[in-house]
């Protein structure tokens, strides 16, 4: 770690820079009154930039574009936040700059009419709104004697980048601008692919890999300065995901020198951003998994691994072109999205699997056999899907427009349509599937106790559930002892498959407003807490309100025989129909990583999951005793990081309900 990196890391961790910020929200509704929707969004971006004061953190801040306001201007006519979970066309941005994209929009004006013209003018005005803050930062850099930064800002981001540093500076500006444009969850996409040409440009004029690594580390640090402002559900849920490796659009292996530089930078810095994702396949050598495990060992909760062999065919089955499918990345958490040409909403809704089982269980007495009950559960899954898709389409009937983001999403300018109005090539939606393992375990328990053993009647089971198992502890223990997903048991694993496929089938034929499809997934996001809160006790022995499993993982009440059995369970069926995203999530005791043998076993476990057809996996290196102490004494653990669902955050900054869930997850050792 160089001195420059150490200095910036110290500034980040001290957090004194936060004292430079101004607070409060300015209402600018009167200033935008009378403007059309496109011009209003452009004006709001201009006003947000105008409120910022160029600020550089110490003598080694080579990027700037740090937030000095904690809130963007408010407009009562703007009903929602900007578009999120979209990957921009970074290749075009880096090669042509803002001015090149603006010129493209100006050229399209020649034959534009009506709303097309309004849209293109909104794009042009949004891009022009960037000029002032760029120039003010350039002047500030000159005054402060930052010759390198000042010179770079004379070129980028208005024009194309000529070096690795200028490309990084363009990216930092875009992160800053997108947040001021009200966009949330703006991932960084396939960083080692679109940055490779600029790495090579710098190498060709004498830059060393150590110098490139230093720039990369300084860039990574810069992404962490304002994460307390860029909130999702919790601090850390900010969408700064980065994808490394994987197949190129031409079908070649995309891993390159930058892949390793990024992994090394993340390992050395030990920060929550950017969240690293590795694309792999059945041909990936064990050495890659061992390299990833060294990063997991740091307790960062990443890398997350994605299986090209499963994901690419699944995306093609949903209608994505092969080249585009090969170029997939991830959204803020783990949803699979396209790079630079899509307006997909991969987290549009969330199915509550145990809710469907709860509704079916109330009618259990009407079922003559288990097959009838299974069909009833599937019917309830479909009914819930029907309602969720209907509600969502009503909610998104007239979303706010976003000409700024539209400028960087392929086809929008050429089609003369906003990204929120079908301008992009792809407009698909995704639906999460929360509590899948809990639902499968509950259905399994009903089969075993009600239909096979006949040791409990439907009325007795429903009475126990209604009572939240108060006075029914013996029955609850018997339900908990029933077979569970995660133990390589064909019964619950087969039921899990049936429920997953029922979900996928229920979404077939559903369309989005712009002709897209709905994609089923195995993720839960925060619904493992929120959705669980509205469902009563369930037949797996879970009490009312108790948390579900996180995404695609064994339930919290499952007694598991070991990590390999869990891997076998969750790779026991073809995951392509439910490949919207949602990782197999597993917790391994941090003691495992104290020797080389434990690291090798962890790497082998991840490889086994991928080789068996798993779609996505993430690992937490945790220590329950340490987490309990951190919960009691947060001041002693300011830098303790955990994987929450699709993102990593500082444990001490999480709400207690999310802390509790991480603590309750199974903690594996290798025998």
Task: Give the ranges of each region predicted by the language model.
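Conserved catalytic cores of very large enzyme subunits
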Residues: 1-122, 148-158, 163-671
């Amino acid at each position: 770690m160089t001195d420059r990196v150490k200095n910036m890391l110290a500034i980040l961790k001290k957090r004194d820079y936060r004292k430079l910020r101004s607070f409060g929200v300015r209402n600018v509704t009167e200033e935008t009154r009378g403007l059309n929707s496109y011009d209003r969004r452009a004006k709001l971006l201009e006003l947000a930039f105008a409120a910022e004061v160029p600020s550089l953190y110490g003598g080694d801040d080579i990027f700037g574009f740090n937030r000095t306001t904690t809130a963007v201007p408010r407009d009562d006519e703007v009903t929602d936040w900007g578009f999120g979970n979209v990957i921009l066309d970074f290749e075009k941005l880096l090669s042509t700059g803002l001015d090149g994209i603006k010129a493209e929009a100006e050229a399209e004006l020649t034959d534009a009419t009506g709303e097309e013209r309004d849209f293109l003018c909104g794009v042009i005005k949004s891009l022009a709104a960037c000029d002032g803050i760029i120039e003010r930062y350039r002047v500030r850099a000159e005054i402060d004697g930052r010759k390198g930064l000042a010179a770079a800002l004379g070129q980028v981001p208005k024009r194309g980048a000529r070096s690795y540093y200028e490309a990084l500076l363009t990216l930092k500006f875009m992160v800053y601008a997108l947040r001021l444009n009200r966009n949330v969850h703006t991932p960084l996409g396939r960083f080692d692919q679109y940055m490779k040409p600029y790495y090579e440009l710098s190498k060709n004029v004498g830059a060393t890999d150590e110098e490139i690594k230093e720039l990369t580390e300084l860039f990574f640090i810069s992404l962490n300065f304002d994460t307390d402002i860029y909130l999702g559900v919790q601090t850390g849920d900010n969408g700064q995901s980065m994808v490394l490796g994987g197949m190129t659009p031409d079908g070649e292996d995309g891993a390159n020198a930058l892949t390793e530089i990024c992994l090394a930078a993340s390992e050395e810095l030990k920060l929550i951003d950017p969240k690293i994702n590795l694309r792999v396949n059945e041909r990936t050598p064990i050495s890659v998994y061992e390299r990833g495990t060294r990063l997991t060992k740091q307790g960062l909760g990443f890398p997350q691994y994605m299986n090209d062999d499963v994901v690419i065919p699944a995306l093609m089955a949903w209608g994505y072109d092969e080249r585009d499918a090969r170029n997939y990345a991830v959204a803020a958490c783990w949803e699979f999205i396209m790079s630079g040409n899509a307006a997909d909403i991969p987290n549009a809704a969330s199915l509550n699997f145990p809710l469907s089982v709860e509704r079916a269980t109330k009618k259990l007495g009407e079922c003559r056999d288990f097959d009838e009950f299974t069909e009833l559960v599937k019917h309830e899954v479909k009914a819930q899907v029907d309602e969720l898709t209907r509600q969502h389409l009503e909610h998104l009937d007239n979303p706010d427009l976003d000409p700024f983001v539209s400028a960087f999403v392929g086809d929008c300018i050429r089609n003369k349509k906003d990204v929120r109005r079908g301008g992009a090539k792809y407009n698909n939606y995704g639906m999460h599937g929360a509590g899948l393992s809990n639902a499968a375990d509950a259905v399994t328990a009903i089969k075993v106790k009600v239909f096979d053993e006949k040791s409990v009647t439907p009325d007795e089971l429903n009475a126990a559930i209604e009572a939240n198992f108060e006075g029914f502890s013996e029955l609850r223990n018997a339900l908990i002892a029933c077979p569970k997903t995660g133990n390589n048991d064909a019964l619950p694993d087969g039921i899990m498959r049936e429920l997953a496929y029922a979900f996928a089938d229920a979404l077939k034929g559903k369309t989005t407003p712009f002709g897209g499809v709905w994609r089923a997934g195995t993720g839960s996001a925060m619904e493992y807490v929120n959705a669980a809160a509205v469902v009563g006790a369930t037949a797996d022995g879970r009490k009312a309100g108790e948390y579900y499993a996180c995404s695609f993982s064994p339930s919290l009440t499952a007694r598991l025989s070991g990590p390999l059995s869990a891997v076998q369970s969750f790779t026991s069926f073809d995951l392509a129909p439910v490949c919207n995203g949602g990782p197999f999530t597993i917790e391994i005791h941090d003691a495992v990583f104290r020797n080389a043998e434990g690291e090798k076993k962890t790497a082998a476990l991840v490889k086994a999951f991928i080789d068996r057809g798993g779609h996505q996996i993430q690992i937490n290196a945790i220590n329950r005793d340490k987490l309990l102490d951190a919960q009691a004494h947060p001041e002693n653990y300011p830098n303790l990081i955990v994987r929450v669902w699709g993102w990593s955050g500082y444990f001490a900054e999480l709400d207690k309900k999310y802390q509790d869930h991480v603590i309750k997850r199974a903690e594996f050792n290798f025998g």
